[in-house]
């Protein structure tokens, strides 16, 4: 792992943008994208940049079950608001949170991922070490699947909803094996609340109890952390 410790999210986003620009210049054609607060500044810098994605495909990590584009809290809505409306891609794929047959939807998405191997994957990390919506205990060999969200994840995401009771309890997520197939992974984490998860990811045992710890087994992982998130690293 390569670790960049930065002073704030803008500085972290600048580091990530520089890496992305280098990869695009080197022929990257498929981006794996994440939602949540960690990549917001990164997406802002992309919107303000001269980068062109007309020949680039994107695939997103996950989507809430039961939410579609009309919902402000769906991830398709998030991506359109924060990136796609300004920087359209050749193709953009997300799981369909309104699919009536979730098993068929996971199979459809796995096929998309097989057809579009990810060159550059952006990740955040949950306080419990989840990546995507792969909660503790998720198998390292897992593919796209239906997830029962952990209480800590539901609690963490409640701030995005007017009514905490409206937070979805399920999601469709890429599996850990899907994530690990990316050629380059850039994980961004900011804030003291992420410090324990980062320590376990970087310095702990590789265990399914800490999903992000599997990144120790990847050949090209870059962590972008602020000083608070990095504060417990030795």
UniProtKB/Swiss-Prot annotation:
Pfam families: Glucosamine_iso (PF01182). One of its GO terms (cellular component) is cytoplasm. GO terms for molecular function: glucosamine-6-phosphate deaminase activity; identical protein binding. It catalyses: alpha-D-glucosamine 6-phosphate + H2O = beta-D-fructose 6-phosphate + NH4(+). This is Glucosamine-6-phosphate deaminase. InterPro entries: Glc/Gal-6P_isomerase, Glucosamine6P_isomerase, Glucosamine6P_isomerase_CS, NagB/RpiA_transferase-like. The keyword Hydrolase applies. Its EC number is 3.5.99.6. Keywords: Carbohydrate metabolism, Hydrolase. PROSITE patterns: GLC_GALNAC_ISOMERASE (PS01161). GO terms for biological process: carbohydrate metabolic process; glucosamine catabolic process; N-acetylglucosamine catabolic process; N-acetylneuraminate catabolic process. Belongs to the glucosamine/galactosamine-6-phosphate isomerase family. NagB subfamily. Pathway: Amino-sugar metabolism; N-acetylneuraminate degradation; D-fructose 6-phosphate from N-acetylneuraminate: step 5/5. The keyword Hydrolase applies. Gene3D superfamilies: 3.40.50.1360. The active site is at 62 (proton acceptor), 128 (for ring-opening step), 130 (proton acceptor), 135 (for ring-opening step). Catalyzes the reversible isomerization-deamination of glucosamine 6-phosphate (GlcN6P) to form fructose 6-phosphate (Fru6P) and ammonium ion.
């Amino acid at each position: 792992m390569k670790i960049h410790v930065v002073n704030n999210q803008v500085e972290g986003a600048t580091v990530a943008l520089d890496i992305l620009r280098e990869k695009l210049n080197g022929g990257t054609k498929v981006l794996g994208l994440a939602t949540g607060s960690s990549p917001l500044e990164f997406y802002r810098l992309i919107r303000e940049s001269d980068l062109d994605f007309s020949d680039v495909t994107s695939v997103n990590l996950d989507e809430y079950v039961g939410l579609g584009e009309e919902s402000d809290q769906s991830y398709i809505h998030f991506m359109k608001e924060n990136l796609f409306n300004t920087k359209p891609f050749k193709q953009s794929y997300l799981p369909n949170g309104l699919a009536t047959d979730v098993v068929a939807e996971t199979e459809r998405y796995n096929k998309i991922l097989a057809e579009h191997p990810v060159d550059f994957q952006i990740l955040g990390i949950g306080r419990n070490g989840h990546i995507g919506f792969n909660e503790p205990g998720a198998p390292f060999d897992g593919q796209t699947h239906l997830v029962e969200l952990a209480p800590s994840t539901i609690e963490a995401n409640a701030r995005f909803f007017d009514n905490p009771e409206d937070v979805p309890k399920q999601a469709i997520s890429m599996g850990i094996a899907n994530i690990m197939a990316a050629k380059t992974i850039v994980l961004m984490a900011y804030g003291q609340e992420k410090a324990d998860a980062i320590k376990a990811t970087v310095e702990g045992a590789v265990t399914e109890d800490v999903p992000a710890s599997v990144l120790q087994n990847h050949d090209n992982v870059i962590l972008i952390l602020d000083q608070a998130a990095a504060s417990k690293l030795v």
